[in-house]
């Protein structure tokens, strides 16, 4: 049995759905929200690589490197904000972040 494009797309759809379920089922914990967003982004990247490999074009694979760079910066900034929020408010619960309003 060979692995076709449909297998990669199904796996990407499953990973994307897990990320969406992670966002909808747990809206309180900021770490799980960030992890779910990153999982969704990685599912999209896997689809880019699968399509570019299947069609023999390397543009999709190069585009994935740019997306991963932006995702790494997003994760670093998100975790830095998370650390600051935990230091100031002693919580990472999203519902308790209403104290930031002016």
Swiss-Prot record:
> Which chemical reaction does it catalyze?
a quinone + NADH + 5 H(+)(in) = a quinol + NAD(+) + 4 H(+)(out)
What membrane topology does this protein have? Multi-pass membrane protein
An example Gene Ontology molecular-function term? NADH:ubiquinone reductase (non-electrogenic) activity
Which compartments is it annotated to reside in? Cell inner membrane
Which is an annotated Pfam family here?
Oxidored_q2
State the UniProt keywords alphabetically: Cell inner membrane, Cell membrane, Membrane, NAD, Quinone, Translocase, Transmembrane, Transmembrane helix, Transport, Ubiquinone
Q: Which GO terms describe its cellular component?
A: NADH dehydrogenase complex; plasma membrane
Q: Which Gene3D superfamilies match?
A: 1.10.287.3510
- Where is this protein primarily located? membrane
The enzyme's E.C. designation: 7.1.1.-
List where the protein spans the membrane: 5-25, 31-51, 62-82
Q: Name one GO biological process term.
A: ATP synthesis coupled electron transport
Query: So what family is this one in?
Result: Belongs to the complex I subunit 4L family.
Protein role? NDH-1 shuttles electrons from NADH, via FMN and iron-sulfur (Fe-S) centers, to quinones in the respiratory chain. The immediate electron acceptor for the enzyme in this species is believed to be ubiquinone. Couples the redox reaction to proton translocation (for every two electrons transferred, four hydrogen ions are translocated across the cytoplasmic membrane), and thus conserves the redox energy in a proton gradient.
Supply the PANTHER family for this chain: NADH DEHYDROGENASE SUBUNIT 4L-RELATED, NADH-UBIQUINONE OXIDOREDUCTASE SUBUNIT ND4L
Indicate the quaternary assembly.
NDH-1 is composed of 14 different subunits. Subunits NuoA, H, J, K, L, M, N constitute the membrane sector of the complex.
Q: What is this protein called?
A: NADH-quinone oxidoreductase subunit K
Organism of origin is Bordetella avium (strain 197N)
């Amino acid at each position: 049995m060979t692995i076709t494009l449909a297998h990669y797309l199904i796996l990407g759809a499953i990973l994307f759905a897990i990320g969406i379920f992670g966002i909808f089922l747990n809206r309180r914990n900021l770490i799980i929200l960030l992890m779910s967003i990153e999982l969704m982004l990685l599912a999209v990247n896997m689809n880019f690589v699968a399509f570019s490999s299947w069609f023999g074009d390397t543009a999709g694979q190069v585009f994935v490197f740019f997306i991963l760079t932006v995702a790494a910066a997003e994760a670093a900034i998100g975790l830095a904000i998370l650390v600051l929020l935990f230091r100031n408010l002693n919580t990472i619960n999203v519902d308790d972040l209403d104290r930031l309003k002016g």
